[in-house]
Amino acid sequence: MLSNEKDYLLNPPLSLLGPEPWDLDVNTFHKGLQRRKSEPIKEALLDQTLISGLGNIYDDEVLFATKINPKMEANLISLKQAEAIKKESIRILREAIKNGGSTIRSYHPKEGVSGMMQNELLAYGKGNTPCSRCGFPLRKISIGGRGTVYCPICQHIEGKPLIVGVTGPIASGKSSVSTYLESNGYQKIDADAIVSSLYMESDVKNGLSSLFGEEAIKDGNVDRDYLSKVLLDGANKEKLDSFIHPLVYKRIEEEINNSKAKRIVIDVPLLIDSPLEEICDLIIYVEANEKTQIARLVERGKDPKTSLAINSGFPRGKAKKKAGIVIDANYDINHLKKELESYDFLLDK
């Protein structure tokens, strides 16, 4: 189908585009958001039939400027917030046009021209860097299949807790970090404690018995020593993880949903790439060298060789990359506390 400059906007797919920010009727826009129940506002803004001209980069910038959390449900956006979205969309797009657009990786607005707007971006592409307003590490998550960056403090959803996830390999010092945060006003949710609780439940015992034989249960209790031996087989470890992890994640989510705390720390060894990763506002990765791990395992009465072998698959590199804070826990507790105290934004003052 051929079109001319007068009617090209009347034919699909261009005819399906929503108004650009300059032409946006706020009341109509707000009503459109009201119909999008349970859909995150970031995902709604990516829909070009609702508002066109933004895209992933400028959606992050607009939400950062308006202090709206990208995970907030679109139907909960107020008329005042809808007005702010329009205002900031216009301002940011004008600034982008003035600066020639954003040059991200291999994208160029036209041959031989590089946009300078990327130098003005405050959110997009800046995951785990300090927020320009409050200093808290910006968080990168995925919404609608698109990378999304926001500030957990400046874009906090009223009535929702700040969730800090602590992760790291075995005997790295995770518990010391989460216990410190607990002493500073956080509610602590410990995945290992939840596993111990689950191991007391009949259904879980029956499941373990089915997976690993009757030897998995001794005198009515889960035989952890036996499990440690069978888990040296990678296939058996995968079986246990597939069985127990969904139960742990569900229990943690239930505790979070039932909590009235303003700040929650979840201590989860296998946090990375789990369903819990996306709900965390900050990830703290705790690392320790093998010498330190062995010393701590011996102190706990554990066999270092077996324990380290079972946990050899921990994704250290990926966890470190995704963390907003990396803690070196090779030293004593006083050194650890000083390191944590250097992050003022962690403390609920």
What function would you assign to each model-found segment?
Residues 164-166:
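Hydrophobic anchor at the beta1->P-loop junction of P-loop NTPases
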Residues 1-65, 73:
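Phosphate/anion-contacting hairpin/loop surfaces
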Residues 131-134, 151-154:
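Short cysteine-rich clusters marking metal-coordination/redox-active sites
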Residues 172:
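ATP-binding Walker
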Residues 251-257, 263-299:
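ATP-dependent NMP and nucleoside kinases share a basic, alpha-helical "lid"
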Residues 175:
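Walker A/P-loop
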